[in-house]
Regions:
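Short beta-alpha connecting loops at secondary-structure transitions
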Residues: 19, 338-343, 367, 408-421, ...
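Accessory alpha-helical DNA-binding modules that contact the DNA backbone or grooves
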Residues: 31, 43, 47-148, 476-615, ...
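Duplex nucleic acid-engaging cores and interfaces of nucleic-acid transaction enzymes
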Residues: 50-53, 60, 64-312, 316-418, ...
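Low-complexity, acidic/Ser/Thr- and charged residue-rich accessory regions of DNA metabolism proteins
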Residues: 138-150, 206, 228, 245-264, ...
């Protein structure tokens, strides 16, 4: 166990005490958000990512150790376990390395080599290794059933040697390192007709050293191969590898040459290639999943536009645009269908203008949220025209990815059983502006569309990572227990789908929950669930101000004592001044609290009911419309980062297609990844670098024209 902890400590840069604390709390049923927020003094203020890394690595090392024990036991049963082999297995850091060491002892299916051994050809194999002048003559002595001639017997003997040589652990390890450092992964066009949009054109004749392969290229090659467009291969320094293997023999003859050739080309290299491709894919998937997770986190943290009446606008050409007005709380007020763009007639378009203007006036619409899908550019122009008469109203282009998934879901049907799918989408688009987090948690995060090659990675690992991000953000922000949907509540630490639905049902039957203590009355919500969830649930209606903060009920008594010592009766300016000036270290000791816990309590008391998303960028509000034909190279624009990928970032500048900032145009300094400079949701100033009107593509730069010279 100590060695495992030492490995975790070494890899993650955490102390043995931190590891033990995290794993002990987890074993007791504590959730990651709870540990990160309410056990800082025990963990040394580890955040959610660090805590999850400890838990994940512990699980991975446990699986590795279990496999080592199983392998050692099987080799021991054969009586072939040496001290050197045991040590090599015990120090192996990868499962693949353990399997390589186990390979010579692994129970094999019936191979050519095993058949040859059973036929008694092993002595002939040994003769090949000696300087025998006439092997063919000697081989005649080994003719038997299945090996009717001396030539066939020699072939069987070669098979025995090929298997033995190809399982040489040292040679396989040397070959693996050689391929990793010097071999190239290649791709050739296999069937260009399957690549109608020429997405894979740059890979029709491609090669790159294995050790420098970028993750997005690995995933692109995998996809191209899967679609039948590309043929993937390797370029090796084969002669050098053959020379490695030849050093195992003291004599040279045609049979040994054959043994070396077959071992390398038929056995070892194909196995190493499979391993390398698996490792490249795993590394690429890990990077893609991390990137998607980072993008999702930033999207969920976009500042909400609270307290605004919003009109959701789901654009379409032929079937008409679906509109939905929601009040400041997100409650649907009305829905309507209009025909604002061609092929609608001129009369229909004029009627649509009047209908939109009437809705704005009747319901006091403050912002129009336009989905960025089909017909969004034309719809933006239409809305901008109408807003000339409403200078106080703005519009925003909203990323509608996943809105159609939500609108067709069981959750949406329960919420709006009498509405069409399209009208539900319009409501979702409007609500995304008011509270992105509350609305986006209703959608499978894989459908939100802020990733790269997300359909080409392990869906299980992707789901686990994205769910972790959603859980983390929801608990960091906190949830209003009286307004949250079951979908949002289910991400609160300690709560599951059943308990979340029970909370909503309890609200409907008993009215608003007025204190955290009352939450205990919800069916199926036991003591452990309450402990984990309570601090993340907010109750603005409570008479106890602490119920609308991140202060955990377990610390209410300490806070009362704090108020008593500081003579605080209300959280006015005088009280805030007292809280800011107190000595945390001394007061923490007096209250029997950890200093980190007291710091968090004070932060909550200084800003009760705070939403830390308010410190992030809000969406860009627009009143006019921009067309790609209006752009000129060198033009300065404001935009919002919509997606970050390995090679750059896509930015909404108010036209139909997002513009691309290539990584080379992000900084005057060298950067390894775009995420070092921008994040999803960032407001950025960009300059137009290149315009392709025909393909509707715009290249942007974060560097002013004079900075790129």
């Amino acid at each position: 166990m100590d060695k495992k902890y030492e490995k975790i400590s070494q890899d993650l840069g955490v102390t043995l005490k931190q590891i033990d604390t995290v794993l002990s709390l987890t074993a007791e049923g504590a959730t990651i958000p709870f540990i990160a927020r309410y056990r800082k003094d025990m963990t040394g203020s580890l955040d959610e990512v660090a805590i999850k890394a400890i838990i994940d690595l512990d699980k991975s090392l446990t699986n590795l150790n279990d496999r080592k024990e199983a392998v050692l036991a099987k080799i021991q049963e054969q009586g072939k376990l040496t001290k050197e082999l045991e040590e090599a297995i015990l120090v192996a850091e990868k499962l693949a390395d353990v399997e390589e060491l186990y390979l010579p002892y692994k129970e094999k299916r019936r191979t050519k080599a095993t058949i040859a051994r059973e036929a008694g050809l092993f002595p002939l194999a040994r003769l090949i290794l000696q300087n025998i002048v006439d092997l063919e003559k000697e081989a005649e002595k080994f003719v038997c059933e299945g090996f009717a001639t001396g030539k066939e017997a020699l072939t069987g003997a070669v098979d025995i040697l090929v298997e033995a040589l190809s399982e040489d652990v040292t040679l396989r390890s040397m070959t693996y390192q050689e391929v990793l450092r010097h071999s190239k992964l290649t791709s050739q066009a296999k069937d260009e007709s399957l690549d109608e949009k020429q997405v894979f054109q740059i890979y029709y004749d491609f090669s790159e050293t294995v050790g420098t392969m970028q993750g997005y290229r690995t995933l692109a090659l995998n996809r191209g191969e899967k679609l039948g467009v590309l043929k993937i291969g390797f370029e090796h320094a084969t002669d050098r590898i053959l020379a490695f293997f030849a050093t195992r023999f003291k004599v040279k003859n045609a049979y040994i040459d054959e043994v070396v050739q077959q071992s390398v080309k038929k056995k070892v290299l194909p196995a190493i290639e499979r391993r390398i491709r698996t490792e490249l894919t795993e590394k690429a998937e890990e990077g893609a999943i991390q990137l998607f997770s980072d993008n999702l986190r930033n999207l969920l943290l976009v500042a909400p536009l609270k307290g605004r009446v919003v009109l959701g606008f789901d654009p379409a050409f032929r079937t008409g645009a679906k509109l939905a007005v929601v009040d400041a709380t997100g409650k649907m007020l009305t829905t309507q269908v209009i025909y604002p763009v061609k092929p609608a007639s001129a009369r229909q378009i004029e009627e649509a203008k009047k209908d939109l203007a009437d809705l704005i006036g009747q319901y006091g619409v403050e912002i129009i949220a336009i989905g960025n899908g089909t017909a969004s550019r034309e719809s933006g122009a239409f809305v901008a025209e109408v807003l000339k008469d409403f200078p106080e109203v703005s519009y925003v282009i909203v990323n509608e990815s996943g809105a159609s998934v939500y609108s067709a879901s069981e959750l949406a049907r329960q919420e709006f059983p009498d509405l069409t799918v399209e009208k539900r989408s319009a409501i979702s688009i409007a609500r995304r502006l008011q509270d992105p987090l509350a609305e986006l948690v209703k959608i499978d995060p894989k459908s939100i569309g802020v990733g790269q090659y997300q359909h080409d990675v392990s869906q299980k690992k992707l789901s686990e990572s994205l769910d972790f991000v959603v859980d983390t953000v929801v608990n960091q922000v906190g949830v209003n227990v009286n307004t949250a949907s079951p979908a949002l509540l289910s991400h609160v630490a300690g709560l599951n789908k059943t308990i979340s639905e029970n909370i909503v049902k309890y609200r409907e039957e008993e009215g608003k929950i007025t204190s955290r203590a009352q939450i205990k009355k919800v069916p199926r919500l036991g003591a452990k669930a309450f402990e984990q969830a309570a601090g993340f649930l907010r109750i603005p209606e409570s008479s106890n101000i602490l119920d609308n903060t991140g202060v955990h009920p377990e610390n209410y008594t300490a806070v009362k004592e704090l108020f008593k010592r500081l003579d605080i009766k209300d959280l006015n300016e005088e009280a805030q001044s007292k809280l800011k000036s107190l000595s945390v270290k001394e007061m923490a000791q007096e209250l029997d609290l950890g200093p980190e816990t007291l710091k968090d309590i004070i932060a909550d008391l200084l800003k009760p009911g705070r939403d830390f998303r308010d410190s992030f960028d809000a969406p860009v509000l627009r009143q006019d419309v921009l067309d790609i034909k209006d752009l000129v190279v060198g033009q300065k624009l404001e935009g919002v980062v919509r997606n970050v990928v390995d090679f750059g970032a896509f930015v909404d500048i108010g036209i139909h297609e997002d513009g691309l900032i290539h990584i080379s145009h992000m900084s005057r300094k060298f950067i390894k990844h775009p995420s070092q400079v921008v994040s999803v949701g960032d407001l950025v100033t960009v300059w137009v670098k290149k315009i392709d009107t025909e393909r509707e593509k715009v290249n942007l730069s974060l560097l002013a024209p004079n900075e790129t010279d």
